[in-house]
Structure formats: C-alpha cells, structure tokens
Regions:
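Conserved beta-strand-loop-alpha-helix junction that forms the acyl-donor binding cleft
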Residues: 107, 119, 133-144, 160-164
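Conserved GNAT-fold acetyl-CoA-binding loop/helix
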Residues: 26-48
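A short beta-loop-alpha structural element at the N-terminal edge
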Residues: 5-20
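Conserved active-site alpha-helix within GNAT-family acetyltransferase domains
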Residues: 113, 125, 138-156
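Conserved beta-hairpin
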Residues: 55-71
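Conserved acetyl-CoA-binding loop-helix of GNAT-fold acetyltransferases
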Residues: 102, 108-121, 145, 149
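Conserved GNAT acetyl-CoA-binding A-motif
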Residues: 116, 123-135
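Conserved acyl-donor/pantetheine-binding loop and adjacent beta-alpha core of acyl/acetyltransferases
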Residues: 72-99
C-alpha cells in the first residue's frame, strides 16, 4: 500500500525543496561511505535538476504535503546517458531514470520501491515508452541488489572519472 497522498510533476516553486532533498541524500550517502552524488555537495548538478523541473521531468511523491521522495524521468538521453549507453541511447525507446531520492524520514518504508512501481506503470501509460534505463555505482552492493530485486536486467558497466557504473534496464 502506498504512503503517498499525491504524485505530482514538480513545479518551479518546488525546486528549493527538491535540491535540499538531493543534498540531504548526498550527505547521507557520504556518511555511508559512498561518493555517489558527491558533486551535489560542491554545488555541481550534472543532471541540472532545476532545468529538469522546468522541462517537466521531475516527479515528487508527497505524504501530507511533505516530499517523501522524487525521481527524474528523462524522455531524451542526456550527455551522460549517451556516453554510457552509446548507440542504444539513440533508439528512442527508453526513459532514463535519474536521481531517485527518498527523504530519510521515510527510510525503511519501501518508498524507493513504491516510486519504482509507480514509474513502471506511468512510463508506458503516460510517456509511451517501453523501457526504463538507469545506472548506479557498481561499488554500492545494496543499490545494485535493490534494482535486481525489482527485476531490472544488468546489461553492462560504464566507466568515467567518478567510477564504474552498473547499467540496468527493464522492458515494460
């Protein structure tokens, strides 16, 4: 059963709260020993979240008005996706999922899983795409297990200066 009282496409006035959620998530990851999203703590945002909000690609999941979680669903691959997915990024068949983040006040309540389940229904019905593609640091076993447990197929690894990334996709 979902804890969300609403799921909304983020509006520009949500941007400050969204960026705070991302920074808090990056701080939590750092405390857990992960450098994923570390750039956010230096004021760098490779996904340009405010612009993604303006494009209508950011979805927020609320519980009684509070943001419990968020996700970015990009209909067009960004430069990172094109680097990582190479020729597949140009097939037009997929949504690229980025910045799945859960408010730590909701930890342990399957919020991430609920966001992913919502996404798997929303993408084919509303965005008319048949594949979700995503990546995460290979060095985070729990995160890789999270996606495998949701039946995402591991399709390879990509490397950049920040590390090695596991690539996952799910055909819907």
């Amino acid at each position: 059963m979902s804890i969300f009282t609403s799921v909304e496409r983020a509006e520009p006035e949500d941007t400050t709260e969204i960026m705070r959620l991302l920074a808090n998530t990056a701080e939590w990851l750092l405390r857990k020993g992960s450098t994923q999203w570390n750039a956010l703590l230096r004021g760098e945002d490779s996904h340009n979240t405010p612009e993604a909000v303006n494009r209508g690609e950011v979805y927020i999941f609320r519980d009684e008005g509070k943001i419990a979680g968020m996700v970015i669903l990009m209909e067009q691959p960004n430069s990172w996706d094109r680097h990582l997915w190479a020729g597949k990024a140009e097939d037009g068949a997929a949504i690229y999922l980025h910045r799945l983040a859960v408010n730590r006040k909701y930890a342990g309540r399957d919020v991430g899983k609920q966001i992913m389940q919502w996404t798997e229904s929303f993408v084919p019905e509303q965005l008319h795409k048949g594949i979700i593609r995503l990546d995460c640091l290979s060095s985070i076993p729990a995160l890789n297990e999270f996606y495998r447990n949701l039946n995402y197929d591991f399709v390879g690894e990509g490397v950049n200066s920040s590390g090695t990334y596991s690539m996952y996709e799910k055909k819907l």
